[in-house]
């Protein structure tokens, strides 16, 4: 499994941007005995359609096949899809879009006895985020240092 996906990212991002789309995430995983290169793309403002995904899948596949040296010499399955409603929050622009939205945050270490929080993102800066969480019937503001955040994504509020 490649440790560095940067050459792949640098090769395919211009193809994706050239179709007015955004590269949301890229991952290379092994499931059972099969390797997968998963590429998540989106298009603003209304999301990406299946025709665009199919076209990008073809173009990205061709781009990857033409790379020398081959960054993925072992056989793999290419999956290109929308990130869905619970898209990851990774880049700074993702965090900005998440302001006021309901999000899921996973931490490296427990904070106030928990490693996972869901709530509305009230504010953020370079150092921390402010999340409004609900504990039973009361609301509480929680400040989380950004360096403690292992993962974040949009969430669906029930």
UniProtKB/Swiss-Prot annotation:
Looking up CDD domains in the UniProt record yields: YlxS_C
Reply yes or no: does the keyword Cytoplasm apply.
yes
- Predominant location of this chain? cytoplasm
Give TM regions: none
Query: Alphabetically, which GO biological process terms does the record hold?
Result: ribosomal small subunit assembly; translation
Location in the cell reads:
Cytoplasm
User: Keywords, A to Z?
Assistant: Cytoplasm, Ribosome biogenesis
Identify the GO cellular component terms for this protein.
cytosol
Determine the domain of life of the protein's source: Bacteria
Instruction: Answer yes or no on keyword Cytoplasm.
Output: yes
HAMAP family per the UniProt record, alphabetical: RimP
- Which family does the record assign? Belongs to the RimP family.
The record describes the protein's role as: Required for maturation of 30S ribosomal subunits.
| Record-given protein name | Ribosome maturation factor RimP
Species annotation: Lactobacillus delbrueckii subsp. bulgaricus (strain ATCC 11842 / DSM 20081 / BCRC 10696 / JCM 1002 / NBRC 13953 / NCIMB 11778 / NCTC 12712 / WDCM 00102 / Lb 14)
């Amino acid at each position: 499994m490649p440790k560095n996906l940067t050459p792949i990212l640098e090769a395919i991002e211009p193809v994706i941007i050239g179709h007015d789309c955004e590269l949301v995430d890229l991952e290379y995983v092994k499931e059972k005995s099969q390797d997968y290169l998963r590429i998540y793309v989106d298009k603003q403002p209304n999301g990406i359609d299946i025709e665009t995904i199919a076209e990008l899948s073809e173009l990205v596949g061709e781009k990857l096949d033409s790379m020398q040296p081959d960054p993925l010499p072992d056989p793999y399955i290419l999956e290109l899809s929308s990130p869905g409603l619970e898209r990851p929050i990774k880049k700074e622009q993702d965090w900005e879009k998440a302001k006021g939205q309901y999000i899921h945050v996973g931490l490296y270490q427990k904070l106030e006895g928990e490693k996972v929080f869901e709530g509305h993102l009230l504010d953020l800066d370079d150092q921390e985020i402010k999340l409004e969480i609900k504990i039973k019937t009361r609301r509480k503001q929680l400040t989380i240092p950004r360096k403690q955040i292992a993962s974040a994504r949009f969430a669906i509020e029930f």
